UniProtKB/Swiss-Prot annotation:
Cofactor: Mg(2+); Mn(2+); Co(2+); Zn(2+)
Biological process (GO), any one: pantothenate biosynthetic process
Binding site for Mg(2+): 45, 84, 114
Activity regulation text: Inhibited by isovalerate, pyruvate, 3-methyl-2-butanone, and valine. Partially inhibited by formaldehyde and tetrahydrofolate below or near the KM value. Also inhibited by later intermediates pantoate, pantothenate and coenzyme A.
Positions of 3-methyl-2-oxobutanoate binding: 45-46, 84, 112
Domain of life assignment: Bacteria
Protein name: 3-methyl-2-oxobutanoate hydroxymethyltransferase
Name of the gene this protein is made from: panB
Organism listed in the record: Escherichia coli (strain K12)
Record keywords: Cytoplasm, Magnesium, Metal-binding, Pantothenate biosynthesis, Transferase
Entry annotation: catalytic residues: 181 (proton acceptor)
NCBIfam families assigned: panB (TIGR00222), PRK00311.1 (NF001452)
UniProt cross-references to HAMAP family, sorted A to Z: PanB (MF_00156)
Pathway: Cofactor biosynthesis; (R)-pantothenate biosynthesis; (R)-pantoate from 3-methyl-2-oxobutanoate: step 1/2
Length: 264
């Protein structure tokens, strides 16, 4: 099988072909996802909550991300693999480059970082040094203490305009992908249409180019709060492989996420 690349996702955007992505943290699930054709994965700092049992993503380290990235890469050698740079791993461009190099050596194809225009210099530096970047705007979980909880972002004209400005700035700096989390559908549509790069949504309606879910949410094995945007595909199929196929099919057809999973 040919490796999945960012160029393929750019082609999907141009063709208006929706695509599914998912978080992965280990060899076995990564192999299962790849076997079913789900070939874009993220080693997210969400592992702090889903795997390590913390109440936020903040305790996750670069070493944690690198460890899980290597495991996922062994399970899915041809996937397009994104890896989060965790909290305080990119406070300066130089620090970002050093830590990005660590997760890239572990097997990542691209690093994901949370934040807006303040990251422009960092995105430029990484891109110039052959480290592809995925931006992340909206509800950025590493900023939970600033937001005062996990809340929808970008409501109102001023907040929406700022997120659009941030998105355009990240794209101009060289970001090749963007994750939009927990924003109103109307804003997600504006941003997706304004950018040439693919936009992946989570809690952003079905108007983005792609979707991502934390795998534990997709299979209904979360220990606590279930996000509004989550759907338990395993409950409907009773089989993990069938659940993966249904998730992909519903994303590609625009059935998921539905109105009940979206914000306004």
């Amino acid at each position: 099988m040919k490796p999945t690349t960012i160029s393929l996702l750019q082609k999907y955007k141009q063709e208006k072909k929706r695509f599914a992505t998912i978080t992965a943290y280990d060899y076995s699930f990564a192999k299962l996802f790849a076997d079913e054709g789900l070939n874009v994965m993220l080693v997210g700092d969400s592992l702090g909550m889903t795997v390590q049992g913390h109440d936020s993503t903040l305790p996750v380290t670069v070493a944690d991300i690198a460890y899980h990235t290597a495991a996922v890469r062994r399970g899915a050698p041809n996937c397009l693999l994104l890896a989060d740079l965790p909290f305080m791993a990119y406070a300066t461009p130089e620090q970002a480059f050093e830590n990005a190099a660590t997760v890239m050596r572990a097997g990542a194809n691209m690093v994901k970082i949370e934040g807006g225009e303040w990251l422009v210099e960092t995105v430029q530096m990484l891109t110039e040094r052959a480290v592809p970047v995925c931006g992340h705007l909206g509800l950025t979980p590493q900023s939970v203490n600033i937001f005062g909880g996990y809340k929808v972002q970008g409501r109102g004209d001023e907040a929406g305009d700022q997120l659009l400005s941030d998105a355009l700035a990240l794209e101009a700096a060289g970001a090749q992908l963007l994750v939009l989390e927990c924003v109103p559908v109307e804003l997600a549509k504006r941003i997706t249409e304004a950018l040439a790069i693919p936009v992946i949504g989570i809690g952003a309606g079905n108007v983005t180019d792609g979707q991502i879910l934390v795998m534990h949410d997709a299979f209904g094995i979360t220990g606590g709060h279930i996000p509004k945007f989550a759907k338990n595909f395993l409950a409907e199929t009773g089989d993990i492989r069938a659940a993966v196929r249904q998730y992909m099919a519903e994303v590609e057809s625009g059935v998921y996420p539905g109105e009940e999973h979206s914000f306004h």
